[in-house]
């Protein structure tokens, strides 16, 4: 998030690139660490200090006058001073300032763990199933192997096997020289003993060679390993283990290694390698660190974006995000306490797993593994997570950013108009009058049928005949844009010449329906009016339906 100097033109940019925020980025955004799960003190009705609505971190609830008599106490001054030591007096900062939660143990980010394809899986060359077993403390993962020790043990095992073979050969050779010896029985016994020895050697060799980085070991498998084998490897569990593996990745070296491997690969193997390479090269270009896919510092969004509102009768209605943040803080504080007390490993592991599940539910409650977080109010409904606020028709992008209300626009149901030309659309008279109202007012004044804007507006309200004549005049040669959501490609928005019609539905030529993916079973379309001469020229020359016949 780049700091802008006053007077910077925020519209002056060439492109937007999304990247993964690392620990340092989040701490730069933040104005303080949230330590308590409390929100508002129910006696004083003021935000709790270091809580989810803390005024010191997020700014004052009400605008402050620094010269006011009330603004004297140390507490009041503290809550109004930001981290640069400047006094904050406007409550609007509570829509901008972020906080953070320092996690007691790293957790894997669910978007990168369970996405399709799994980013962490592609980085480490592992399946999502195996990653989940590690992240949720069901299995160990090998973090490092002492190869020199392993090779020495393998050489010792081989030497022992060779010595045992020689001993068997000598023993059976001596037994075969005795007069009463049953040569056939001895040969069978010798062969059986040698086969057992070779099988035992092969088993030990396979077991040693299988101890490599990123190998998954269940609890029983690890416990059943001989002690000297356990000393060869470093194992881990949970988000901490995944973070350590990601820390060790050198993108340049890994890209070079995979490129060489892909040159000699074929078929499905090559396809998998190319998929990994594509993601790794993208991360390298964007300067993304692999360990950013694990969360150690969790950002907390501004309180005015997750409000708490008092209802009549003293009760409070709160955003679901506050409940989800509260779960994370409670579990994080409990884990810190257990670590300070040096609690048994099994208890700490369980608390780390619960912390992982709480962060999963906060980020994406649909994909959370440990059961979806539900409301504690008795309604048993699923809590809305950060992902739910962003995705879908009601999400931040489609509802608030792409779906903003626009002046000089309208919306109506579409019906077939086969008598129209392909570059024409039927526009209801009342809708056209509202869209072209300023132009109609200008035309009425130009014709001297009205002396000012007020008298022209009065004529329009009364529906005088001169108004419709003026409307006919102003729409000549004009183009309007028709858009059908979702706008998936360029043909979702096309320009048409309006033809005034009775009724309330927009008429559309059947032959242009394909581009809009529209049909006449109740679909709705939006109309937009390009205002400037340049916009009209662009609509006429580039966006007109008769100029978009070939895709």
Predicted regions and their residues:
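Conserved core architecture of multi-subunit DNA-directed RNA polymerases
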Residues: 1-551
